[in-house]
UniProtKB/Swiss-Prot annotation:
One of its GO terms (cellular component) is extracellular region. Expressed by the venom gland. The modification Pyrrolidone carboxylic acid is found at residue 1. This peptide both inhibits the activity of the angiotensin-converting enzyme (ACE) and enhances the action of bradykinin by inhibiting the peptidases that inactivate it. It acts as an indirect hypotensive agent. One of its GO terms (molecular function) is toxin activity. GO terms for biological process: regulation of blood pressure. Keywords: Hypotensive agent, Metalloenzyme inhibitor, Metalloprotease inhibitor, Protease inhibitor, Pyrrolidone carboxylic acid, Secreted, Toxin. Belongs to the bradykinin-potentiating peptide family. It comes from the Eukaryota. This is Bradykinin-potentiating peptide 12a. It is found in: Secreted.
Amino acid sequence: QGWAWPRPQIPP
């Protein structure tokens, strides 16, 4: 994957 989706880091 070339596109890095900026997903928020949500702790479990």
